[in-house]
Amino acid sequence: MIASVGDSRYYPKSVANGEKSDQRERLVSAIPVEDDSSFELKLRPQWLREFIGQPKVKENLAVAIEAARSRGEALDHVLLYGPPGLGKTTLANIIANEMQAQFQQTSGPTLQIKGDLTAILTNVRDKQVLFIDEVHRLQPALEELLYSAVEDYKLDIIIGQGPSARTHTIDVAPFTLVAATTRAGLLSAPLRSRFGIVLRLEFYTTEDLKIILKRSAEILNVEIDEGGAAEIATRCRGTPRIANRLLRRVRDYAQVRGAGKIDRETAQKALEMLEVDQHGFDEVDRRLMLTIIEKYQGGPVGLNTLAASLAEETDAIEEIYEPFLIQLGFLDRTPRGRVATHLAYEYFKMKPPKKQDSLF
């Protein structure tokens, strides 16, 4: 029997009570948590040849890097975009390694005033890689400061105020800006046009995720067979960060409740205990789909209305929940709003209304 939206047994207490879910508490959230940092550093590939998946991205980068190195120049500026957890930060590190260049990392929200960015740009070294994560959250004034720096390797600094103010131009060492975003549509056209290399990262295939899991298991010194890797790979939402997080939890289960080896049966039992189903859905995904089905007859329902019903931010729905549900075909995003597809009804063993029958 499928629980209804109001059934508190179906969700954690905070979700059932209508509180906003904390993405950091979701096992299948691609948003990084503090606990992930040291763990991810252990598993992070250092070179393009070690990076699994994203063949088009790797090919484009390999050609661009080899060409830049042969000319003795800094690599052209790179924009990496796509859902969280797919390897944008890892690729930025790899670019620096492949270019044998220094690496510096910052983020859009961290840079608050012009002085923050000016201090970084005036100290960049020749061919250095400067990585700005969440670049879509960069303030407009700081965006404008970047224009001349990335295009002409010059920085215009205003000294003084009022009528006596004057502009002083400083030369900046040729460097590579690598920017990452989950919301490419929020970037201004002038900033986006300054990236010579623009690459989209896609969700990973099950086969690639199995290879990633086997590599991670070897580094963690835990035995995993084909069935165990396949079981985790099908439930990690096409995202390596989630795959590695689930691997840690399944490893714990195997050591305490199993024989120390991760096989299919052990992985299934562990993931059932963690309430991650065969699609990689958790209670928050189910709540979103059930809300559309039960409260709005399958949709369409507007984003703001849906966000209010779920007590969630619109950004969280657009950036975190929807991409994977749309990718799997459980949700449609239409001009009139969000629509639950026939797959969502089948998942809950419900019959679509007549309007859904006609659509699918």
Swiss-Prot record:
One Gene Ontology MF term: four-way junction DNA binding
A Pfam family annotated for this UniProt entry: RuvB_N
Gene Ontology biological process terms, A to Z: DNA recombination; DNA repair
Region annotation (Large ATPase domain (RuvB-L)) ranges: 12-204
UniProt-annotated location(s): Cytoplasm
Sequence segments annotated as region (Small ATPAse domain (RuvB-S)): 205-275
Keywords of this entry: ATP-binding, Cytoplasm, DNA damage, DNA recombination, DNA repair, DNA-binding, Hydrolase, Nucleotide-binding
Top-level taxon of origin: Bacteria
Function: The RuvA-RuvB-RuvC complex processes Holliday junction (HJ) DNA during genetic recombination and DNA repair, while the RuvA-RuvB complex plays an important role in the rescue of blocked DNA replication forks via replication fork reversal (RFR). RuvA specifically binds to HJ cruciform DNA, conferring on it an open structure. The RuvB hexamer acts as an ATP-dependent pump, pulling dsDNA into and through the RuvAB complex. RuvB forms 2 homohexamers on either side of HJ DNA bound by 1 or 2 RuvA tetramers; 4 subunits per hexamer contact DNA at a time.
Known partners and oligomeric status: Homohexamer. Forms an RuvA(8)-RuvB(12)-Holliday junction (HJ) complex. HJ DNA is sandwiched between 2 RuvA tetramers; dsDNA enters through RuvA and exits via RuvB. An RuvB hexamer assembles on each DNA strand where it exits the tetramer. Each RuvB hexamer is contacted by two RuvA subunits (via domain III) on 2 adjacent RuvB subunits; this complex drives branch migration. In the full resolvosome a probable DNA-RuvA(4)-RuvB(12)-RuvC(2) complex forms which resolves the HJ.
Entry note about domains: Has 3 domains, the large (RuvB-L) and small ATPase (RuvB-S) domains and the C-terminal head (RuvB-H) domain. The head domain binds DNA, while the ATPase domains jointly bind ATP, ADP or are empty depending on the state of the subunit in the translocation cycle. During a single DNA translocation step the structure of each domain remains the same, but their relative positions change.
UniProt protein name: Holliday junction branch migration complex subunit RuvB
Lineage: Bacteria, Pseudomonadati, Acidobacteriota, Terriglobia, Terriglobales
Encoding gene, per UniProt annotation: ruvB
